[in-house]
Amino acid sequence: MKVLVLNAGSSSLKCQYFIDEESIASVTIERIGEKESYTLLTYANEKREHTSTVKNHHDAIDTLFSLLKESHIITDVTELNAVGHRIVHGGPHFSRPTLINTEVIEQIRSLIPLAPLHNPSNLEGIEVIAKVYPALKQVAVFDTAFHQTMPEYAARYPLPYDLYEEAHVRRYGFHGTSHAYVAKEAAKILQQPLETLNLITLHLGNGASATAIKKGRSIDTSMGMTPLEGLMMGSRSGDIDPAIIPYLVRTQKIDVETIDSMLNKESGLKGVCGNNDMREIIDKMDEGDEKSRLALEMYVYRIKKYIGAYSATLGHVDALVFTGGIGEHAALVREMVCEGMEYTFGIILEKKKNDSAKQEASAIHSRESRTDILVIPTDEELEIVRQTEVIVSRLS
């Protein structure tokens, strides 16, 4: 099956082209709407880049398909079986991948207040393709869908009940496509059906989230109504006392919009040590920088708290899974997270295995560990392809 995976951002368009679940080519278009837009095509181990003027997402879609045809990657759009779209927020409506039609488009539009930075761009990509190539099947894959299996007591906030009914205030969770992918890969590695496994998955990148998976289903996750809740992240605060916000409004004369921007873009690792690149933070810590040390210790401590909470919730944990840019590449972070968990949780990391874990799935626990510890590179695009194929296959 030939599937194009599309991720439309506010000023960018990223796509990957798959044939039978094998990635063939990728195209990235950045700085859409600016005088000089940047386009990168990666195909057959070669990279072609150039600058041009891409005025809007309509132009970007035209550029994308022109590149694919000019490079003889496809001969015509009609040979595609479907386009799979990454949609950040599915709200309470979507718990699975969905074939896109007019009704689905309007439901995604209604969710813009829940994801004002992402859903409008995601929607624009859908609408441009629907207009230019109306016969091309499109499937929406939602970042929030995997977490729709959370029980009510985990998904609700202890706020007035009316806020849920009137404003849909509840926990939705994010990174669902990544957590779903690595959970399935963990089941393959463990040679057990996913429905029998209890897992804690840690997606650690610039954005970070933890998920408790019981018998293959998400029962809790660290991100909430927005991706701001939960773990300390690259530039997002994660969990804080909500009373800090009105306190800052009163005492520092900062408006809510400024605080919102601060919590999302100037907090987390960046807020504590001025840097959100974990490699540089570790290097500076080794050079004796105390703010970098503090930032890393805070980062690890908060991950440990979630592992402890989720271990109690799950009862027993078959595997702890690290993924995402930091989870896959920062051996020191993995070591610090697992340190001290031997007695209570039976989590014992083997340093040699951990230090040598590179670009492929690896088991990094010792023989004595009661819990498997896995490093699994995530592949959200492949997961979107697989979910898209399921929907399209049902139409045949």
Swiss-Prot record:
Keywords: ATP-binding, Cytoplasm, Kinase, Magnesium, Metal-binding, Nucleotide-binding, Transferase
Active site: residue positions: D143
Catalytic reaction equation(s): acetate + ATP = acetyl phosphate + ADP
Binding site for ATP: K14, H203, L204, G205, N206, G207, D277, M278, R279, G325, I326, G327, E328, H329
Gene Ontology terms, MF aspect: acetate kinase activity; ATP binding; magnesium ion binding
Cellular component GO terms, alphabetical: cytoplasm
Primary location group: cytoplasm
Cofactor comment text: Mg(2+). Can also accept Mn(2+).
Cofactor field: Mg(2+); Mn(2+)
Gene3D superfamilies: 3.30.420.40
An example Gene Ontology biological process: acetate metabolic process
Site feature: Transition state stabilizer: H175, R236
Listed CDD domains: ASKHA_NBD_AcK_PK
Record-listed Mg(2+) binding positions: N7, E380
Subunit (UniProt): Homodimer.
Classification via NCBIfam families: ackA
Similarity comment text for this entry: Belongs to the acetokinase family.
The protein, known as: Acetate kinase
